[in-house]
Swiss-Prot record:
This is Neuroblastoma suppressor of tumorigenicity 1. Residues 38-127 form the CTCK domain. Belongs to the DAN family. Disulfide bonds join 38-88, 52-102, 62-121, 66-123, 85-126. Residues 145-170 are annotated as: Disordered. The gene is nbl1. May act as a tumor suppressor. Keywords: Disulfide bond, Secreted, Signal, Tumor suppressor. Residues 1-19 form the signal peptide. Pfam families: DAN (PF03045).
Amino acid sequence: MVMCVRAVLVCVLLELSRAAPHAHINRLALFPDKSAWCEAKNITQIVGHTGCTPRSIQNRACLGQCFSYSVPNTFPQSTESLVHCDSCMPAQTQWEVVTLDCSGSDEAPRVDKLVERILHCSCQSCSKESSQEGALLQLYPHEGAQDLPSLPDATHTHPQHAHMQADQRDADAHLDMHAPEAG
């Protein structure tokens, strides 16, 4: 009985690994009552810098449970490696400049920090790089801070495909290049 279950598992996982370069898995045959989920949850993020007054901004964090599995391999290898890893991570983001008041600092009266705002999250490959297509890059300079778009209310569990965008006016924004601080 155990060998039969293992054989079925190997067959199911082998078919899944052949389906697409990296298909999102919402359910596994061994756990039909469990499903993957990934949501963008509202948070308050504190943006700070040494010598500056920290600012609180509304942002989102990705939270969820996505599937991963690894089936023991053989040597020499008789089948494709049966390893899959998904993680709940941003599917769509935008960048904005947050200006901090540093009136007590000798270096500068203010510092601009580049902050990633999360719009949507989804289960995606653990090996996904942040520069991959699907990221929405919009940089909002501090001069137009009052015109920033608000975060959408709806959350999505599927990847949102967007295009890389950057206006010429964004190139004029001053960015703080120091290592990010906690928070």
